[in-house]
Amino acid sequence: MVENRLSSGLEDYLECIYNNIQNKGSVKAIDISRELNVSRASVTDALKRLASKGYISYERYGKINLLDTGIEKSQTVIEKHQILTTFFEKILKLSNKEATENACRIEHVITENAFIQLKGFLND
C-alpha cells in the first residue's frame, strides 16, 4: 500500500526522476545525484525509501522506473509547482527566480483545499 504523505525531500526526488524520464527517456542514480547536488549514498537511501513505499522500482546501478503511483504523485507535485509559480509571477509580479524558489518550498506543504482554491482562482 502506498503511503500518500512524503517528505519534501522525497517529493523532490520523485520530481527529479519524473522530469529526467520525460526529458531523457531514463534516469540513473548518478543523474539524480548531480541534479540535486547530493551524494550517491543519499540517492540510494531515498530510492530505497521510495521503492518501499511503492512509488518506484529500481535495480542498483541500473534504471529507475516510476510505478503508477509514483507517476501520479510526481505529476501532482509538478502541477502544484507550476500553479504556484504562475501565481507568484502573474499575480504577485515576482521574478521567475523568486517565484520558482517560493513554489519549490510551498508545493510540499500547501493543503489540498488551498491548492484547489488557488487553481480555481487562476483559471477564472
Model-derived segments and spans:
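DNA-binding alpha-helical recognition surfaces that contact promoter or target DNA
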Residues: 15, 45, 101
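N-terminal helix-turn-helix DNA-binding core of bacterial DNA-binding proteins
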Residues: 2-38
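C-terminal regulatory/oligomerization modules of transcriptional regulators
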Residues: 101-124
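Short amphipathic alpha-helical/adjacent loop interface patches that line ligand
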Residues: 10, 81, 103
